[in-house]
A protein has these predicted regions:
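Short recognition helix of helix-turn-helix/winged-helix DNA-binding domains
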Residues: 1-60
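Residue-level marker of intrinsically disordered, low-complexity segments enriched
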Residues: 4-5, 10, 25-26, 87-89, ...
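Winged helix-turn-helix DNA-binding recognition segment
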Residues: 46-103
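Short, amphipathic alpha-helical interaction segments positioned at domain boundaries
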Residues: 106-108
């Protein structure tokens, strides 16, 4: 069993504030852009299935992010973990049986 990150509501609020500041140009960085691009990619993929889930390959997520470091397959799942911790997606299962669901609209 993989242990998932657990944040307090205050930590989630702080992280979302940081992401919104990146969106608004108050903080320089690509982290918010990567999370946003991945969310939009997952939302599109999930909308194509009957049960509203998707299970993209790691390299597909990196291509969607515009990253050329395809050997770093863990990067996409790291961002998925962050999106799940913040409450935007839900992941179930593992490996080929993993399912990703969109749980709420992105607001950062």
């Amino acid at each position: 069993m993989i242990k998932k990150k657990v944040l307090t509501q205050e930590q989630i609020t702080e992280k979302l504030d940081y992401l919104r500041k990146q969106r608004d140009g108050l903080i320089v960085g690509e982290y918010r852009n990567y999370l946003y691009k991945l969310y939009m990619y997952l939302k599109e993929r999930c909308s194509e299935t009957e049960d509203g889930s998707c299970n993209p390959y790691p390299w597909q997520m990196l291509v969607a992010l515009g990253r050329d470091d395809l050997h770093k397959s863990y990067v996409g799942y790291t961002y998925c973990d962050d999106l799940e911790t913040l409450g935007y997606i839900k992941m179930q299962g593992y490996g080929k049986d993993k399912k990703i669901f969109i749980t709420k609209e992105i607001d950062f």
